[in-house]
A protein has these predicted regions:
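N-terminal alpha-helical modules
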Residues: 20-125
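Bacterial N-terminal signal peptides that target proteins for export
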Residues: 1-11
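Hydrophobic h-region of N-terminal signal peptides that target proteins for export
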Residues: 13-21
Length: 125
């Protein structure tokens, strides 16, 4: 198989995967976080709370669906992931100026979103 054909097939597979993932993201549109710093931080907290609920549902389903030997490992991995996320985002929050609060909030939102999507995908592998 030629290199160009392999690249085309690979790109098509990636695009198909992205479109499937995006289709699963439909639901409540996320609010826009425009405004002053306080409003933006509060908005990021609200978005994070939405993703955290979705994460908790996905985690409970993943634990329920996991093989018995996998459950303890999944629980341990989730505890360590929460510790990592919190420490990682705290780093951003310790920066200077009001932008640090926004960086920390976006860190929490984006990492929580990514983990929720990862756990939701466990049953589709």
């Amino acid at each position: 198989m030629s290199m160009m054909l392999r690249m085309t097939i690979g790109l098509a597979a990636v695009l198909a995967l992205v479109s499937v993932v995006r289709a699963g993201d439909q639901g409540e549109p996320e609010p826009s976080c425009d405004g002053n710093t306080f409003q933006m931080v509060e908005c990021l907290k609200a978005k994070t709370a939405q993703w955290d609920k979705r994460l908790n549902v996905a985690y409970q389903k993943a634990v329920q669906d996991a093989q018995p030997a996998q459950r303890d490992q999944l629980r341990a991995a989730q505890r360590l992931w929460v510790q990592y996320r919190d420490a990682n985002c705290l780093y951003y929050g310790m920066g200077e100026g009001t932008i640090a609060r926004l960086d920390a909030g976006e860190c929490m939102r984006s990492m929580t979103e990514a983990r929720a999507k990862e756990l939701e995908g466990l049953g589709h592998q």
